[in-house]
Design a protein with these regions (language model features):
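Cyclophilin-like peptidyl-prolyl cis-trans isomerases
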Residues: 1-143
Length: 143
């Protein structure tokens, strides 16, 4: 299974870490299929760090109305360029907000603290072009 994230800057293809973060991937896919992400904004963009989205209010304080547990023990729990990872307000408080990593150098401290659940495999150049306030949508495809 993979997804296409269409932004104001272009489209990125994402492959999921289903083996390493099965519950997080299932949650993201469910939200995407339900249309939860359609038209939401990247509300937090810090160049050289991350582009974060998934808040239904567009300001970083909202979610889907529930929390999911972190999954931090898999092999792919390293915040490299293009990795998708769950944002949270503390361990096991993630829901819908996620971020896309801009740089390994600035995000190594997030390893095994935030669940990495996928990686951009096409359109990697778009990751660093995303601007705060840009909108996005997610479409999931069966492999």
């Amino acid at each position: 299974m993979h997804a296409k994230i269409t932004t104001d800057r272009g489209t990125m293809t994402v492959e999921f870490f289903e083996k390493d973060a099965p519950n997080t991937v299932a949650n993201f896919i469910k939200l995407a299929k339900d249309g939860f992400y359609d038209g939401l904004k990247f509300h937090r963009v810090i160049p050289g760090f991350v582009a974060q989205g998934g808040c239904p209010h567009g300001i970083g304080n909202g979610g889907p109305g529930y929390s999911i547990d972190c999954e931090l023990d898999g092999d792919n729990q390293y915040h490299d360029l293009g990795v998708l990872s769950m944002a949270h307000a503390g361990r096991n408080t993630g829901g819908s907000q996620f971020f896309i990593v801009h740089s390994r150098e600035a995000t190594a401290h997030l390893d095994r603290n935030h669940t990495c659940f996928g990686k951009v495999t096409e359109g990697l150049d778009i990751v660093t072009q995303i601007a705060q306030g840009d909108t996005f949508s997610v479409k999931v495809f069966e492999d």
